[in-house]
Amino acid sequence: MVEAPGSAPRILMLVGGPGNGKTEAIESTIGWLDGALGASDRLVQALAGAFLPAGDGFVPRLVRVDAGALGSPGRQLAISIVQDASTVLDATGRPAAQLLLDELEAMQSAPETEAYLCCVNRGVLDDALIEAIDRGSGCSRELLEAVTRAVSLAPDAPSCWPLDSFPAVAAWPMDAESLLLPPARGGEAPAKSLVRHALEESRWLPAGSCAAGPSCPFCGSRERLARDRDEGSLLRMLRWYEVASGKRWSFRDLFSLVSYLLAGHRVSPRDAGLEPCGWAARLAGLDETANRGGKPSRETSSSIFQLVAAQYQHALFHRWDRDAGPSLLRDIKELGLDDDNTAMGLYWFLSSRRAPYLPSMIGDVLEGLGELLDPALAAPDAEVQASRNTRFALREVDIRFSRSVLEGLDYLRKLQILTRLEVELIGRLARLDGELSSPGVRRRRPLSATNLQRFIRDFACRLVRRSLGTRTATVLDAPILSDFQRVIEDGEGEGLYEIAHEVEQLLNRNQDFEISLTTTFGQPLPPLSRRAMLVVPARSVRPLQANASGRPASPIPFLKVGDGRSSQPIALTYDLFKAVRELEEGMSVASLPRTVLALLDTTRARLAGPIVRDGQLLERARIQVGSPDTSVVQRRVGFGIRKDGATR
């Protein structure tokens, strides 16, 4: 762009949602251009002044600078930058899509010394395409269609840098690449750099100066995440969330998540002004009152629960049975334990979860993370590497906590793998559990005592599972997630062949592929006697190699179903991969989740249309009417009926 105008794309579009780093990419590009021009920061300063006007001025939508005149030596190069294409300031009421279309039309006819950098979300891009169609702007419509295809996740998406038919235009999908993977050119994963930056010791209070002392959950989280194992497990779980959900962590999401894990989220307006360590110190003081046997209150009794919940492992997996509060309180009162700080603290803690308590920015993401990965739901046979020389199955923890909280605590205490706050809370729960086992308490209400005791043991066991699972990445379906991640990140696609074979068996029945002729997509099949099925030879399923030239690697692997014109691509989703793995372990096909059944039905429906129009394929087809023993087949002249292998 600087040394040889016309040799590189000059219309650059960064496409993606908010928080994906589009603005930062523009800033880096300007820095590189400034250096290439020999502008000595004059280009950076000129743009900074335009995008950061003095006083109450508004940030303009488009800023144009004569970059060539600022360089040394001077040359012809003008740069126009749209930092946010959804902005409509000073547009006299015109929508953002019209402004974007006007800018693209102007830039296409501009000389090679004019460059255009634009950050745009997919919604504005689609609206601009609709506007181009309405205007009848053929060239602009073709350009926007090419951009839309190039930044899509389709397996046949063409090159986006540059566009195939528009060498002067380049686009890049900013939401396609994972921040948890190292860049293709080498270096550290952005998410890893972000976490390590937040954990730098120089950015925290000196050791021993925290107002909360050893009771501070945030300083404790920082200390644990500074260890390679804990940090690696956190990043691995965040990556597993991506591969399972199909979503990507944006920069904005990661910044919010790290802030939430290391500084907490305070809901009460009274606590909003407190520093994280100050908030922890206040709760630690309140807990001292409860621990000395003070009168139970919502603040004092639940303090230890809130401190434990603020540790990163419990902030990440935060879900508790929020609806258990009323029945829990009833059992507590029937047993006369409403003066017990631990029992009432448990009730008040669960009740607090009925109100919103997560940061609104990442609340939905945290809910999805807990649903997909919660270590409390991991298989009992899953093994935890607690230390270098100690490894055990979660079943060992479950068995001990099912007998008593104290037995579970004694088993884990000697391994020194729980935090001080966790040991303190579980110790109090163990004392309450022991009290519920005493004849004096059980005699009053044996059923209430049993219910409360079961709940306490389950609570303690879940707490321990989350602590162990988060620090070792022993989460729900961890082996399947690890295998799926390996398949996705395998550049050669070797792991896809085995999966393709299993999907082929799911789509076909024995050696046949069946298409219903009496129903449309989504309708249930009629009774067997009223069915008419077109039966063709089985459709093959093979890995589909996505185009990787001039574009980011596809975040989703695809399979190719069928041959020739009737072939169709299907996405290998986590649900489909998991279903295949579970079928290998003996699960019945009837137990497949609805999402997988819908994907298979959709694939059959998409294949059906081209198949019924493929004359060559229909030569080997037959129609089953009613019983599978009766088929209509094509003969040299007309059709015949075939029954049990005989022809009539």
Predicted regions and their residues:
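Extended charged low-complexity segments that act as oligomerization/scaffolding linkers
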Residues: 1-6, 15, 23-233
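Short coil/loop residues immediately preceding or within conserved phosphate-binding loops
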Residues: 9
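Conserved beta-strand position immediately N-terminal to the Walker
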Residues: 12
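Walker A (P-loop) phosphate-binding loop of P-loop NTPases
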Residues: 19
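Hydrophobic, glycine-enriched assembly/anchoring segments
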Residues: 25-28, 605-648
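Alpha-helical repeat scaffolds in large eukaryotic proteins
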Residues: 34, 101, 105-108, 124, ...
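Extended alpha-helical coiled-coil/bundle linker/stalk regions that scaffold oligomerization
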Residues: 188, 192-518
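C-terminal structured domain segments
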Residues: 428, 462, 466, 523-625
